[in-house]
Amino acid sequence: MAEIKQWFMSIPIITRYWFGLSIAMPVLGRIGLLNPYHMFMTKDALWRLELWRPFTGTFYYPIGPGTGFHYLINLYFLYQYSKNLETNEFVGKPADYLFMLIFNWSALVLMAVFMNIFLLMDPLILSVLYVWCQLNKEMIVSFWFGTRFKAQFLPWVLLGFNMILGGGGFFEILGILTGHLYYYVKYVYPRDQGGELITTPAILYRFLPNYTPLRSTGFLSFPTASSIRSQRNTASNDSSTSSSGHNWGGRGHVLGGN
C-alpha cells in the first residue's frame, strides 16, 4: 500500500485529482454507495438546478461487463497524456493547465446541453490527448500491433479504431473538436494573427501559483503544499506576468512509446 500511495502522490496535482475522482466515483456507483441516476448530466436536471451534474457527469463512468475494458483504456489515456502535458508543456504552471481543462470542459458542457450527452469522460480525455498530439506532432508514437506513426495522427487513429470495432466515434469527434478549439485560440490564432484570445484568470494563480521545478537525480520534484503557500505572496506578480502570454513550448514524451 505504501508503494501505491507513493506512486499516486507522485502524479502531478491536477492529473492526480482528475485521475482519483475518475476512479472513486465509478467505483462508488458500482458498489451502490452513489446512485448512478444522480451522476448523469441531463437537461431536465439542470433545469431543476441540480448544478452538480456537469461535474459528476465528467468523473462518472458506468462500469459493467460491457464497459469495463473501455473504462480502463480511458484511465490509461487520462493518466498518460494528462500527466505528459502537465509535466512538460505546462510544467511549473498548474493554473494554466487547470484553465485548459476548464476551457475544454465548459465547451463540452455547452455541447452536452444541446446534444443530450449524459457523460463527458470520453470527450474530455480525447480533447487533452488531441492538444498533446498537436504540441508534439512529429513525435513517433507506438500503437497496437506494433504500428508506429506521428503523434498528430493518433486522435484520428483512435476515432477510426472505435468506429470499426465499437460502431461509435461520436465522443471522439467531440473531443477532437474541443481540443482543436483550445489549440486554435491558444496557439494558432496568436501565432498567425497576433494577440491572445484567452488567458488564465488571475484567481487561479492565487490558488495555484507558478513555481520553478526542482530537479535532483534526474527526477522532477513537485512542490509541497507548504512550499506552494510560501509562493502565494508572489502569485500576483506571476499572474500579471502570465497575462501577457506564456511560452508553453516543449516536447512531451509518450510512456510506452519511443
Give the predicted meaning of each segment.
Residues 31, 35, 88, 117, ...:
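Membrane-interface elements of multi-pass transporters and channels
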Residues 26, 30, 108, 131, ...:
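Hydrophobic alpha-helical segments of integral membrane proteins
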Residues 57-167, 176, 187-188:
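Multipass alpha-helical transmembrane domains of eukaryotic endomembrane proteins
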Residues 2-102:
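N-terminal TM1-TM2 helical hairpin plus the immediately adjacent luminal interfacial "cap"
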Residues 29-30, 36-37, 140-141, 169-173, ...:
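Intrinsically disordered, low-complexity regions enriched in proline, serine, glycine
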Residues 1-12, 23, 50, 162-258:
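C-terminal transmembrane module of polytopic alpha-helical membrane proteins
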